Regions:
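N-terminal low-structure segments adjacent to metalloprotease catalytic domains
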Residues: 1-40, 44, 213-214
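Auxiliary, metal-adjacent structural segments of Zn-dependent hydrolase domains
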Residues: 33-91, 158-163
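Second-shell loop/turn segments in exported
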Residues: 46-55, 96, 137-143
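Soluble non-cytosolic domains of exported or imported proteins
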Residues: 52-59, 103-104, 108, 142-146
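Metalloprotease/metallohydrolase-associated module, dominated by Zn2+-dependent proteases
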Residues: 67, 132-215
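Short acidic alpha-helical/loop segments enriched in Asp/Glu that coordinate divalent cations
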Residues: 76-81, 120-132, 165-170
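Short pre-active-site segment immediately N-terminal to the catalytic Zn-binding motif
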Residues: 93-109
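Active-site recognition of the HExxH zinc-binding catalytic motif
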Residues: 107-123
Length: 215
């Protein structure tokens, strides 16, 4: 177990030209309407817009996530790679170019940052079996994608309600998933609502403390 400690990581945004060249071009040819991708300047502008949207509240969000989880990020930088035709994922951290409003970006990026914090931190080994842990906490009858989103959604709700005082973000998050008919994500929210987000986050924090005491 690595005992490395560090401060809040810097979140940096960049248009990933290489990812776009190696993957987005092909995806555009496969799924697009024949319109070519936009220019380098267009996509760097989107990355800059995302950074501008994130900056006013970003450090507050990241610091709060460390506080409410009891975890510290292993890495001191989170590079957010922006490229067309991609949905969001956390490792590496990638965002598409579809966000039109600040709140949509905040919700999605915060979601992915929680994924990163829960699985790449200074408390647990990077190869720790989190699926086994979460099955023991939340049950074995969930779809994989539901299981991994139960802790994410619980901490999102704690952040939205108890830290940011933004219940509107909670509602926007749920409505966006409903509009996409994202059944496994919706099932995770339903579990959180039924169980209670504080029950879930308290259970995770307890395990974090136990994990530290065992080192």
């Amino acid at each position: 177990m690595n005992g490395k400690s560090q401060s809040i990581p810097e979140v940096r945004f960049e248009y990933s030209f290489l990812l776009s060249d190696q993957a987005s071009e092909g995806l555009n040819n496969l799924w697009g309407d024949g319109t070519p991708l936009h220019s380098f300047e267009y996509y760097t502008g989107i990355a800059a817009k995302y950074e501008k949207w994130w900056q006013p509240d970003g450090d507050t969000i990241v610091a709060a996530l460390c506080q409410i989880t009891g975890l510290q990020f292993y890495q001191n930088t989170i590079d957010v790679h922006v490229a067309p035709w991609f949905n969001a994922f956390s490792s590496p951290m990638v965002l598409g170019v579809m966000f039109k409003k600040k709140d949509d970006l905040i919700i999605t990026l915060t979601h992915e940052i929680i994924h990163r914090l829960l699985t790449d931190n200074t408390t647990y080994d990077r190869h720790y079996d989190f699926l086994k842990l979460w099955k023991s906490m939340f049950g074995e009858d969930h779809a994989w994608n539901t299981l991994v989103h139960i802790p994410v959604h619980a901490f999102l709700q704690e952040l939205y309600i108890d830290v940011l005082d933004r219940p509107d973000l909670l509602e926007l998050d749920k409505k966006s998933l409903e509009s996409l008919d994202a059944k496994e994500y919706i099932a995770a929210w339903e579990y959180v609502e039924k169980t209670g987000y504080k029950t879930i986050t308290d259970k995770i924090r307890k395990h974090v403390k136990e994990q530290r005491s065992d080192r």
